Swiss-Prot record:
The keyword Cell membrane does not apply. It comes from the Eukaryota. This is AM-toxin biosynthesis protein 15. Induction: Expression is up-regulated more than 10 fold in toxin producing cultures. Residues 17-43 are annotated as: Disordered. Gene clusters encoding host-selective toxins (HSTs) are localized on conditionally dispensable chromosomes (CDCs), also called supernumerary chromosomes, where they are present in multiple copies. The CDCs are not essential for saprophytic growth but controls host-selective pathogenicity. It comes from Alternaria alternata (Alternaria rot fungus). Part of the gene clusters that mediate the biosynthesis of AM-toxins, host-selective toxins (HSTs) causing Alternaria blotch on apple, a worldwide distributed disease. AM-toxins are cyclic depsipeptides containing the 3 residues 2-hydroxy-isovaleric acid (2-HIV), dehydroalanine, L-alanine which are common for all 3 AM-toxins I to III. The fourth precursor is L-alpha-amino-methoxyphenyl-valeric acid (L-Amv) for AM-toxin I, L-alpha-amino-phenyl-valeric acid (L-Apv) for AM-toxin II, and L-alpha-amino-hydroxyphenyl-valeric acid (L-Ahv) for AM-toxin III.
Protein backbone atom coordinates (compact mmCIF):
# COMPACT_ATOMS: atom_id res chain seq x y z
CA UNK A 1 0.00 0.00 0.00
CA UNK A 2 2.83 2.39 0.86
CA UNK A 3 4.61 1.75 -2.45
CA UNK A 4 1.36 2.32 -4.34
CA UNK A 5 0.87 5.57 -2.45
CA UNK A 6 4.44 6.71 -3.27
CA UNK A 7 3.89 5.76 -6.90
CA UNK A 8 0.69 7.80 -7.03
CA UNK A 9 2.36 10.81 -5.42
CA UNK A 10 5.20 10.58 -7.93
CA UNK A 11 2.73 10.37 -10.82
CA UNK A 12 0.72 13.34 -9.54
CA UNK A 13 3.97 15.32 -9.33
CA UNK A 14 4.59 14.43 -12.99
CA UNK A 15 1.14 15.78 -13.82
CA UNK A 16 1.91 19.08 -12.14
CA UNK A 17 5.28 19.37 -13.92
CA UNK A 18 3.64 18.58 -17.26
CA UNK A 19 0.89 21.13 -16.67
CA UNK A 20 3.50 23.73 -15.76
CA UNK A 21 5.46 22.91 -18.92
CA UNK A 22 2.25 23.12 -21.00
CA UNK A 23 1.44 26.53 -19.57
CA UNK A 24 4.94 27.73 -20.51
CA UNK A 25 4.42 26.48 -24.06
CA UNK A 26 1.11 28.31 -24.26
CA UNK A 27 -1.07 25.25 -24.75
CA UNK A 28 -3.97 24.29 -22.55
CA UNK A 29 -4.98 20.82 -21.48
CA UNK A 30 -8.22 21.00 -23.42
CA UNK A 31 -7.46 17.73 -25.19
CA UNK A 32 -7.36 15.95 -21.82
CA UNK A 33 -10.69 17.41 -20.74
CA UNK A 34 -12.35 16.91 -24.11
CA UNK A 35 -11.28 13.28 -24.49
CA UNK A 36 -8.30 13.59 -26.80
CA UNK A 37 -5.64 11.00 -27.50
CA UNK A 38 -3.95 11.50 -24.13
CA UNK A 39 -7.07 10.43 -22.26
CA UNK A 40 -6.99 7.10 -24.05
CA UNK A 41 -3.45 6.66 -22.73
CA UNK A 42 -1.87 5.79 -26.08
CA UNK A 43 0.27 8.87 -26.56
CA UNK A 44 3.50 7.25 -25.36
CA UNK A 45 5.85 9.38 -23.27
CA UNK A 46 3.60 12.42 -23.48
CA UNK A 47 0.85 10.85 -21.38
CA UNK A 48 0.86 12.22 -17.87
CA UNK A 49 -0.04 9.18 -15.82
CA UNK A 50 0.15 6.19 -18.10
CA UNK A 51 -2.91 4.26 -19.18
CA UNK A 52 -5.27 5.04 -16.32
CA UNK A 53 -7.75 7.78 -17.19
CA UNK A 54 -8.78 8.45 -13.60
CA UNK A 55 -5.27 9.11 -12.37
CA UNK A 56 -4.75 11.51 -15.23
CA UNK A 57 -7.80 13.66 -14.54
CA UNK A 58 -8.19 13.45 -10.76
CA UNK A 59 -4.90 12.31 -9.19
CA UNK A 60 -5.59 13.98 -5.84
CA UNK A 61 -8.90 12.08 -5.48
CA UNK A 62 -7.10 8.74 -5.72
CA UNK A 63 -4.52 9.90 -3.20
CA UNK A 64 -7.27 10.89 -0.77
CA UNK A 65 -9.05 7.57 -1.25
CA UNK A 66 -5.86 5.57 -0.70
CA UNK A 67 -4.96 7.52 2.41
CA UNK A 68 -8.47 6.97 3.76
CA UNK A 69 -8.42 3.23 2.97
CA UNK A 70 -5.02 2.89 4.62
CA UNK A 71 -6.48 4.10 7.93
CA UNK A 72 -9.51 1.81 7.85
CA UNK A 73 -9.72 -1.52 9.63
CA UNK A 74 -12.00 -3.98 7.87
CA UNK A 75 -12.24 -7.71 7.30
CA UNK A 76 -11.92 -9.20 3.84
CA UNK A 77 -14.99 -11.21 2.89
CA UNK A 78 -14.89 -14.98 3.21
CA UNK A 79 -15.49 -17.21 0.17
CA UNK A 80 -19.13 -17.71 -0.79
CA UNK A 81 -19.32 -21.28 0.51
CA UNK A 82 -17.80 -20.30 3.86
CA UNK A 83 -20.17 -17.43 4.66
CA UNK A 84 -22.41 -18.29 7.59
CA UNK A 85 -23.10 -14.85 8.97
CA UNK A 86 -23.05 -11.17 8.15
CA UNK A 87 -20.17 -10.70 10.59
CA UNK A 88 -17.81 -12.28 8.03
CA UNK A 89 -18.17 -9.15 5.91
CA UNK A 90 -17.49 -5.91 7.74
CA UNK A 91 -17.77 -3.13 5.20
CA UNK A 92 -19.50 -0.48 7.31
CA UNK A 93 -16.38 1.65 7.41
CA UNK A 94 -16.35 1.70 3.61
CA UNK A 95 -19.93 2.98 3.44
CA UNK A 96 -19.11 6.26 1.60
CA UNK A 97 -17.36 4.29 -1.16
CA UNK A 98 -19.40 1.08 -1.16
CA UNK A 99 -23.14 0.45 -1.32
CA UNK A 100 -23.42 -1.99 1.58
CA UNK A 101 -27.22 -2.39 1.46
CA UNK A 102 -27.37 -3.48 -2.17
CA UNK A 103 -24.45 -5.84 -1.50
CA UNK A 104 -26.41 -7.50 1.29
CA UNK A 105 -29.54 -7.80 -0.83
CA UNK A 106 -27.81 -9.23 -3.88
CA UNK A 107 -25.00 -11.30 -2.48
CA UNK A 108 -25.73 -12.42 1.07
CA UNK A 109 -29.51 -12.60 1.47
CA UNK A 110 -30.03 -14.36 -1.88
CA UNK A 111 -27.14 -16.83 -2.27
CA UNK A 112 -26.69 -18.93 -5.40
CA UNK A 113 -26.54 -22.35 -3.77
CA UNK A 114 -29.99 -23.74 -2.73
CA UNK A 115 -28.91 -25.26 0.58
CA UNK A 116 -27.35 -21.92 1.53
CA UNK A 117 -30.75 -20.27 1.20
CA UNK A 118 -32.19 -22.97 3.49
CA UNK A 119 -29.49 -22.22 6.07
CA UNK A 120 -30.23 -18.49 5.79
CA UNK A 121 -33.96 -19.07 6.24
CA UNK A 122 -33.28 -21.22 9.31
CA UNK A 123 -30.90 -18.62 10.77
CA UNK A 124 -33.44 -15.83 10.20
CA UNK A 125 -36.21 -17.89 11.83
CA UNK A 126 -34.06 -18.72 14.87
CA UNK A 127 -32.94 -15.10 15.16
CA UNK A 128 -36.50 -13.80 15.12
CA UNK A 129 -37.58 -16.40 17.70
CA UNK A 130 -34.70 -15.44 20.00
CA UNK A 131 -35.54 -11.75 19.58
CA UNK A 132 -39.18 -12.38 20.50
CA UNK A 133 -38.22 -14.46 23.55
CA UNK A 134 -35.71 -11.87 24.79
CA UNK A 135 -38.16 -9.00 24.34
CA UNK A 136 -40.89 -10.92 26.23
CA UNK A 137 -38.66 -12.22 29.01
CA UNK A 138 -36.55 -9.19 29.78
CA UNK A 139 -39.11 -6.44 29.39
CA UNK A 140 -38.60 -3.48 31.70
CA UNK A 141 -41.32 -3.21 34.37
CA UNK A 142 -44.26 -1.17 33.21
CA UNK A 143 -45.00 1.95 35.22
CA UNK A 144 -48.66 2.36 36.00
CA UNK A 145 -50.04 5.84 35.49
CA UNK A 146 -51.14 7.55 38.71
CA UNK A 147 -54.87 7.84 39.28
CA UNK A 148 -56.74 10.20 41.55
CA UNK A 149 -57.71 7.44 44.01
CA UNK A 150 -54.13 6.10 44.44
CA UNK A 151 -52.57 6.65 47.89
CA UNK A 152 -49.68 9.12 48.01
CA UNK A 153 -46.18 7.64 47.66
CA UNK A 154 -45.16 8.77 51.18
CA UNK A 155 -48.01 6.78 52.76
CA UNK A 156 -46.78 3.50 51.29
CA UNK A 157 -43.40 3.91 52.98
Amino acid sequence: MATLLCDLQERSAKVERARHWDSKQGSSNSDVASGGSEVAGNSGNNSYLGDDVGWKIYPYRFLQLLQHLEQLQFTIQAPRHARLGISTVRMWSLRPYYNYDSYLEKDLIQPDVPHDSLIWALLRYVGRAVDRWVSRTFQPPRIRPLHANDPPAEASL
